[in-house]
C-alpha cells in the first residue's frame, strides 16, 4: 500500500523539545516490562543488597531503553497511520521533524545493546533478542504487528519473557535457573491473550487500515475466546509446575487468582469490545500479581 508524501508542518521544524522525545518514548508503556523485570529479580532469590548498581541499570534497560526504544520504532513506522488517527503524536505533528524519529530509534537500539553487554554477556544476548523483536514487530519486511497471531506473541514475548529473563540474569550474573525459564515462558505465552484483548480498542481503525488483528480476522467473540484460553492454560501449567516443585502455597495462590480471572472472563465473553477495558483493569491485574506470586515461590528454591 503506497502512502502520500509525509509532510512536516512548517511551524514545527525548529527542533524537538525534551518533552517531545519523552512523549515519543511513551513512559506509560514502561511499567509492564519493568514489572516483569522485577519478577525476574525476585525469582532469582539473590539479595538485592548484593547487586544494587546492576539492578538499577537493568531496570533502566528494561523500561526507558528497550521498551522506550520499541515505542520510537513503532511510531516511526506507523507515522502515516498516526497522521490520520493520532495527528497530535510527536512525529506526525512535526514536533519530531524529518527523519529524527528514525535516528532516535537507531540510537536507542545501539545504547540498549551497549548497556546490556556492559551488564553481562547473558543480559547482552537477551537485549539483542529484545531489540530484534522490537524492530521485527514494527518494521518491514517482517512487521509482525500486521499479523493478528504473531504480533501479540512477539509483543508478549518481549514485554514479559525477555524482561523477566533479563531481571533474573542480572541478579544471577549469568543464565537463570531452568525452572525460572519455564515459568517466564508460560507467563509470556499467556500474555499473548492480554495483547489480543488490547486490540479490541482499535477494531474499527484496524479494519479500515488493513491491520489484521485477531478480532478483525476471526471476529470479536472468537478472538475473545482465544484470548481467554491463551491466558488461562499457561497459568494451569504454572500451577502444576509450582506444586511439583513443592511450592504448594504459591501454587494455590496462583490457582485462586486464575479462578477469579475465570469469573471475570465471562463478562468479557458476553461483550468483548465493551468489556475488554474492564478486564484489562481487573483480570490483567490478577494475572500480573500471579506472576509476582510465582516469582516469590521460585525464590524459595533458587
Model-derived segments and spans:
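Multi-pass alpha-helical membrane architecture of UbiA-family
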Residues: 1-302
Amino acid at each position: 500500500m503506497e502512502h502520500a508524501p509525509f509532510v512536516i508542518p512548517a511551524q514545527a521544524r525548529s527542533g524537538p523539545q525534551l518533552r517531545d522525545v519523552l512523549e515519543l518514548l511513551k513512559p506509560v508503556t514502561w511499567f509492564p516490562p519493568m514489572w516483569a523485570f522485577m519478577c525476574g529479580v525476585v525469582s532469582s532469590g539473590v539479595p538485592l543488597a548484593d547487586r544494587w548498581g546492576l539492578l538499577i541499570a537493568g531496570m533502566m534497560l528494561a523500561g526507558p531503553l528497550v521498551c522506550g526504544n520499541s515505542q520510537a520504532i513503532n511510531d516511526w513506522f506507523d507515522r502515516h497511520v498516526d497522521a490520520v488517527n493520532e495527528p497530535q503524536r510527536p512525529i506526525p505533528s512535526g514536533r519530531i521533524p524529518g527523519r529524527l524519529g528514525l535516528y532516535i530509534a537507531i540510537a536507542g537500539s545501539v545504547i540498549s545493546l551497549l548497556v546490556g553487554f556492559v551488564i553481562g554477556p547473558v543480559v547482552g544476548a537477551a537485549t539483542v533478542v529484545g531489540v530484534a523483536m522490537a524492530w521485527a514487530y514494527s518494521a518491514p519486511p517482517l512487521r509482525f504487528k500486521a499479523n493478528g497471531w504473531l504480533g501479540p506473541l512477539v509483543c508478549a514475548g518481549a514485554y514479559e519473557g525477555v524482561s523477566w529473563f533479563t531481571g533474573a540474569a542480572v541478579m544471577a550474573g549469568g543464565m537463570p535457573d531452568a525452572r525460572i525459564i519455564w515459568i517466564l515462558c508460560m507467563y509470556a505465552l499467556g500474555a499473548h491473550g492480554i495483547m489480543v484483548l488490547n486490540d479490541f480498542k482499535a477494531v474499527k481503525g484496524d479494519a479500515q487500515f488493513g491491520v489484521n488483528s485477531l478480532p478483525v480476522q476471526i471476529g470479536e467473540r472468537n478472538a475473545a475466546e482465544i484470548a481467554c484460553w491463551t491466558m488461562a492454560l499457561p497459568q494451569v501449567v504454572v500451577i502444576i509446575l509450582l506444586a511439583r516443585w513443592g511450592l504448594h502455597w504459591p501454587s494455590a495462590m496462583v490457582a485462586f487468582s486464575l479462578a477469579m480471572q475465570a469469573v471475570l472472563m465471562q463478562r468479557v465473553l458476553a461483550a468483548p469490545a465493551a468489556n475488554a477495558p474492564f478486564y484489562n483493569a481487573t483480570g490483567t491485574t490478577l494475572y500480573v500479581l500471579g506472576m509476582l506470586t510465582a516469582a516469590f515461590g521460585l525464590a524459595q528454591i533458587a
